Amino acid sequence: MIEFDNLTYLHGKPQGTGLLKANPEDFVVVEDLGFEPDGEGEHILVRILKNGCNTRFVADALAKFLKIHAREVSFAGQKDKHAVTEQWLCARVPGKEMPDLSAFQLEGCQVLEYARHKRKLRLGALKGNAFTLVLREVSNRDDVEQRLIDICVKGVPNYFGAQRFGIGGSNLQGALRWAQTNTPVRDRNKRSFWLSAARSALFNQIVAERLKKADVNQVVDGDALQLAGRGSWFVATTEEVAELQRRVNDKELMITAALPGSGEWGTQREALAFEQAAVAAETELQALLVREKVEAARRAMLLYPQQLSWNWWDDVTVEIRFWLPAGSFATSVVRELINTTGDYAHIAE
């Protein structure tokens, strides 16, 4: 298995170095649900600004304030503790009057707005996130500048970030031990983390191998192509390759890579043979995913940060802004810009 730090770069290994997250204010995340609260219903959506608090801790504190069980407070995704983040929490309060949430007090947190909503906010039910990052102590400004320009055109690999695999790769190591021993794992959280790490590592490996090709974004026979921004996909045939390539070049279509698991992976012929060869040595992880009935899926191979802009405060400090769809990693963008000091693994997804 390729170590995360050794995964293939789309733009070559960065020449410069820099510091990511010198302080929480250098990593700002604003959640984008993609919809507005209904204004009625038995749930309350609460938009929180937080600094120095993890999502679960704030959710539990909100439940205590509302005098409801912790399981009645949900959220679309975990946000990093060591960052400034805006996100929505959802509390189910059937039959109760609208509480005064301006009275909710928690160090490092501020209620920005709240409103009634008809449905529970479920994990993953967000459109994306807007990021504002500050990179400090940057060396080789010219290289970073050129990479930002190139990323606007060619994107970055859509790798799962190091945080998916746990500190020191602990989640992936857990998955490997589970695969090798076949010992039942009772802890639901561990099961989820380990299976996710296993599938993500296999995806990363397939993408890393594809990026070694001279023409990375070239459609091959049997590729599974996805409409940009959509989850559905279809298989490319030899007769269609030229037209499909034009649509890929226009970013209308995205080439996908496998999230291996049980069932068919989605690619056929040449593309399927390539993907299978890329992870052929990882028989234990593949068998684990099949045994635990984790269904195979597809994910775009490349990621195009939207609304990408940047501003150099001085020759060694740059502020970068961009928007990413749900499930994508800001650290996968930063990885193509600089060799960072510090460990990505502690950054929440």
From Swiss-Prot:
Q: EC class of this enzyme? A: isomerase
Annotated Gene Ontology MF terms?
Answer: RNA binding; tRNA pseudouridine(13) synthase activity
Q: Which CDD domains match?
A: PseudoU_synth_EcTruD
- Report any Pfam family annotated for this entry: TruD
**EC number(s) per entry:** 5.4.99.27
Taken from the UniProt entry, a GO cellular component term is: cytosol
Binding locations of substrate:
F27, N129, F329
Identify the residues that the record assigns to the TRUD domain, covering every copy. 155-303
Q: Which residues cross the membrane?
A: none
Keywords attached to this Swiss-Prot or TrEMBL record, sorted alphabetically, are: Isomerase, tRNA processing
Reaction catalysed by this enzyme: uridine(13) in tRNA = pseudouridine(13) in tRNA
As for family, the record states: Belongs to the pseudouridine synthase TruD family.
Report the function annotation for this chain: Responsible for synthesis of pseudouridine from uracil-13 in transfer RNAs.
Question: This chain belongs to which protein, by name?
Answer: tRNA pseudouridine synthase D
Q: Which gene encodes it?
A: truD
